[in-house]
Amino acid sequence: ADLGWHGVDGDRRLAFRRLDDRSGFPWLTASKLPELVRFAPRRRGTADPGSLPTHVRTPEGEELTVFGKELATEVGRRHGSPVEMVHLNRGIFDEASISVITSSTVGEIGRLAAQRPDVRRFRPNILIASTRSIPFEEDEWVGGVLSFGEANESAAVCITNRDERCSMVSFDPDSARPDAEVLKAIVRVRDNQAGVYGAVTRRGRLTIGLPVFFEPAAADRRRQ
């Protein structure tokens, strides 16, 4: 995936807008319609990997065009009021355009919740398998920079703050069934925070298996 100034290319560039909503936040999210997590984007043909999906697969397996009337009608029927698909050039994010979590953190939360949670519950852009294998290691990265790959001009992300979790981690990504144990575990041991947010400081290409390097904040380097 290509990492640009506004995050991973294509990430959160599509959203359903509730046509009857006047709240100032018209977007339909899975917190309002949990079944949304079971809709999956698909890209047909030979489009560029960073381009928008061409279709969306419904929970029943039917593939509908992204901007077609059939998809909007189906989602609106489940929601109970009309919606339309909107293309957002820069995306819409909760806190920041990049979210990062380690596999050790996901595993520890699962242990605390007596489950094996799917990492998709946490919706990270970047999942890191740290050689330290320390749960919640990400907390130490705030203020520092992660770079991806060994080249001097490799992609880089400045870690800005910890990720405060919401009810989204409670939904099973395959069934959409809610289970509060994962969120309860995060609240109990980490003050409802797991993973970190970041901002892109250098654009580049991200691929599976890239080595990741951490550079602490300047103040931290002076203390070392």
Give the role of each language-model region.
Residues A1-N152, A156-F171, R205, P211-Q224:
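Electropositive, beta-rich accessory/interaction domains or terminal extensions
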Residues C166-R203:
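A conserved acidic, glycine/proline-rich C-terminal tail/linker
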